[in-house]
């Protein structure tokens, strides 16, 4: 088992406000990990640093053994918390775009998932329901052969039926030697598929542990443990 993500004593500030305070975090290959914390806890900043959207001048993050840069952008596949595609784009346009942008994009896998979800390639993003537009974004993200997949609030405004479909996409696409990091407030929807959970508060990691261990030691579900920690 190899280390996919490594953060060591990572600190990041916006002016005088500290967003992350000496964060150390390792994610191993083959793991599905939940990242949980209230708004303003540092989740978004951490994701932006991992994806290279903002820069850590001290280079305290590595993905697949590489410092954040062009090489890591090629092995990190990221889905933001909002659908990022223009409404006048057809689904097929997005397939073409991903095929051009990413050498590791598996178009056949993406098209197979579209059929399973009853989404047509000629459909316009703006004509799809919010749930279906979210599904398209996630299946495109998961159709790359990446080392680390990051989904930020994949269930944002999505109904329970659509959430179930999105979870099936996640599980059906992630390779065994990759890692999947999911940041969501919908803990109950993902608890059963998680190997590990990371709780973050005020820029600090409260704990990073096996979900099974948390249940066994607390006698509570992960969602209940979260409520206890952050009430």
Where are these regions (language model features)?
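The feature captures the beta-strand-to-loop junction immediately N-terminal to the Walker
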Residues: 36-38
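Helix-to-loop junction immediately C-terminal to a conserved catalytic motif
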Residues: 51
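Conserved ABC transporter NBD signature motif
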Residues: 58-72
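ABC-family P-loop ATPase nucleotide-binding domains
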Residues: 81-136
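Catalytic Walker B motif of ABC-type/P-loop ATPase nucleotide-binding domains
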Residues: 149-153
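ABC ATPase "signature
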Residues: 208-209
């Amino acid at each position: 088992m190899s280390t996919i993500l490594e953060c060591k004593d990572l600190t990041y500030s916006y002016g005088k406000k500290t967003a992350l305070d000496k964060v150390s975090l390792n994610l191993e290959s083959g793991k599905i990990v939940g990242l949980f914390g209230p708004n303003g806890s540092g989740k978004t900043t951490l994701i932006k640093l991992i994806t290279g959207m903002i820069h850590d001048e001290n280079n305290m993050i590595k993905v697949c053994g590489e410092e954040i840069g062009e090489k890591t952008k090629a092995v990190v596949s990221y889905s933001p918390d909002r659908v990022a595609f223009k409404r006048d784009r057809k689904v097929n346009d997005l397939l073409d775009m991903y095929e051009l942008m990413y050498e590791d994009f598996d178009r056949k896998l993406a098209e197979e998932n579209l059929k399973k979800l009853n989404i047509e390639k000629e459909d316009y993003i703006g004509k799809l329901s919010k749930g279906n537009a979210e599904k398209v974004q996630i299946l495109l993200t998961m159709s790359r052969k990446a080392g680390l997949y990051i989904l930020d609030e994949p269930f944002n405004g999505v109904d329970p039926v659509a959430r179930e479909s999105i979870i099936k996409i996640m599980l059906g696409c992630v390779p065994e030697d990759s890692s999947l990091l999911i940041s969501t407030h919908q803990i109950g929807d993902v608890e059963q598929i998680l190997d590990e959970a990371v709780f973050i508060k005020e820029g600090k990691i409260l704990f990073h542990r096996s979900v099974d261990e948390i249940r066994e030691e607390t006698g509570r579900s992960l969602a209940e443990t979260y409520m206890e920690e952050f009430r």
